[in-house]
Amino acid sequence: MPAPLPPSTTPPPRRLEPGRAVLFMAAATALFAGTTLLAKALGTDALGPPLHPFQVSFGRFLFAWVAILMVAAVLRPPMGRPALGLHLGRTLCGWGGATLMFAAAARMPLTDATALSFLSPVLTMLLAIPLLGERVGPWRWAAVAIALVGAMILLRPGPGTFQIAGLLALGAALALGLEAILIKRLTNREAPVPVLVINNGMGVAIALGPALAVWLAPTPAQWLALVGVGVVMVAGQLLFLLAVGRADASFVAPLFYLTLVYATVYDLAVFGVLPDAVSLVGAVVLVSGALLLALREGRRR
């Protein structure tokens, strides 16, 4: 699940409206889970012959770019002077994370894939130590340990049970963690909409070559799903920005874990997959660690 912009990258709210923030986050997380659902449908035979994750991620960036260009045409935000090096690094990480996440979602339950993606903020914290020089206290280390235990439960280590798909999801979380570091640097100097315009435009250029190498003509239903992956992701990101503009980041961040609830419901409704005990325990443990980290970050701010 491609992650939205982190709460710390948006300006402080002018007027606190927590009720509206909850509604915006409920809608945003439903859409974020929806992108993973669409990616799973595209990567399986639900809508036709399975499409390669390279092709799915290309569709995600292409149609997200079209959508955000339409938003930019209406809002007309000043573009300024973009830091192209940071944008390139951020986009490479985002493309890698999206591709790995789409591959994982096609091979494992949405609940497991979504829960493993919540390692992203934990890995961001770990990466911030060498890359941003941040100091980490005992509570944050405890949150990391709890989240990693949950991840190991979800990976089901043991003879014949270790999930390769889980490693793909872990790789996605690592790539998205690196992306979050670069996003923090970018949005300290650039506005969110121009960042999304440049990011998705670069993503199209990066994803085009790999997609052409594995291209399979999509069915009409798959074309609609490819459009949906991009448009739904952008809509979710914009709703997320509306949420963090109406409440403190520490209030909004824990609501992001509603994504896991939606993913579970979608997987059951569309694919008939009900999480087993291992999935539920692992998800609860991992989310507990990530939630502890989010709450501690909120107090620090």
Which residue ranges define each predicted feature?
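Transmembrane alpha-helices of multi-pass small-molecule transport proteins
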Residues: 2-5, 20, 49-96, 175-178, ...
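Juxtamembrane helix-loop-helix junctions in multi-pass membrane proteins
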Residues: 31-62, 178-202
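Hydrophobic transmembrane alpha-helices of multi-pass small-molecule transport proteins
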Residues: 68, 139-156, 278-297
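Helix-helix packing/entry segments at the starts of transmembrane helices
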Residues: 114-119, 186-202, 237-268
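C-terminal-most transmembrane helix of multi-pass membrane proteins
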Residues: 4-5, 261-301
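C-terminal transmembrane-helix exit sites in multi-pass transporters
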Residues: 101-106, 121-142, 214, 261-280
